[in-house]
A protein has these predicted regions:
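Helix-loop-beta substructure at the N-terminus of cytosolic sensory domains
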Residues: 19-70
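Signal-transmission/dimerization alpha-helices at domain junctions
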Residues: 154-158, 167-186
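Juxtacatalytic helix/coil linker segments
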Residues: 185-219
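Regulatory sensory and allosteric helical modules in signal-transduction proteins
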Residues: 66-130
Length: 219
């Protein structure tokens, strides 16, 4: 990916986040543009915790064989039982505990498949796998929303080249910030409907609360 393509993609996802695209729209548009820029992306996953009494978070999934129809899945708690065991065996848990921010496995080149997601990717024909974690600073944490996890897989014969990996590392924060913004907007709407009622909550979302004024100033 050359610098022009990088700038265009970073600009697109930033603008899409600002105008209020949904998480699914952001994921689909981003991944499609990544492949159009020449990166052999076949699978992508972004995970972000949420503020919900039942669901722990949302997973955004994209596949190159269904480029226009990304999937959004909500998942339950992972703090007990089999879900907790699976979480503790995951590459994302390893990154979170180790303080590392990236792990790559060249699956077709014989790299170790030491986590379940690597084995699953290899069995699905993936040749390269990149896992990333972007933790928030303390002041950016909201409840359990403390980082964004993502994974990127290729099924090309030679997988990703080093320039592809670098581009994904540099572009992922743009997508993550846009997804975080969309998630917060969605959660704000849910809270408004919960505490104000559906009609009043939607009215606040559409119209906003009255703007504050101060002597000599208008906001």
């Amino acid at each position: 990916m050359d610098q022009i393509a990088f700038n265009e993609l970073a600009g697109w996802v930033t603008g899409a986040g600002l105008i209020g695209r949904s998480e699914g729209e952001l994921m689909t548009g981003f991944c499609r543009r990544v492949t159009e820029a020449g990166i052999p992306l076949a699978r992508a996953l972004v995970i972000l915790d949420t503020l919900h009494p039942i669901y722990e978070g949302r997973a955004l999934l994209w596949r190159s064989d269904m480029p226009e129809t990304g999937e959004v899945r909500e998942y339950g708690r992972t703090n007990e039982g089999e879900a907790a065991e699976n979480w503790r065996r995951s590459v994302f848990f390893h990154l979170l505990q180790s303080g590392e921010t990236m792990m790559r496995r060249r699956l077709a080149a014989g790299d170790p498949v030491d986590f379940l997601s690597f084995r699953q990717a290899r069995d699905e024909g993936m040749t390269d796998y990149l896992a990333l974690i972007h933790p928030f600073a303390a002041e950016g944490v909201i409840g359990e929303m403390d980082c964004v996890y993502s994974s990127w897989a290729s099924d090309a014969t030679d997988g990703f080249d080093d320039a592809d990996v670098l581009a994904l590392q540099r572009l992922a924060p743009f997508l993550n910030l846009a997804v975080k913004s969309a998630a917060l907007a969605r959660m704000a709407g849910t809270l408004a409907e919960t505490y104000l009622g559906r009609d009043a909550g939607r009215k606040v979302e559409r119209c906003g609360a009255p703007r504050a004024t101060a002597p000599g100033y208008r906001f």
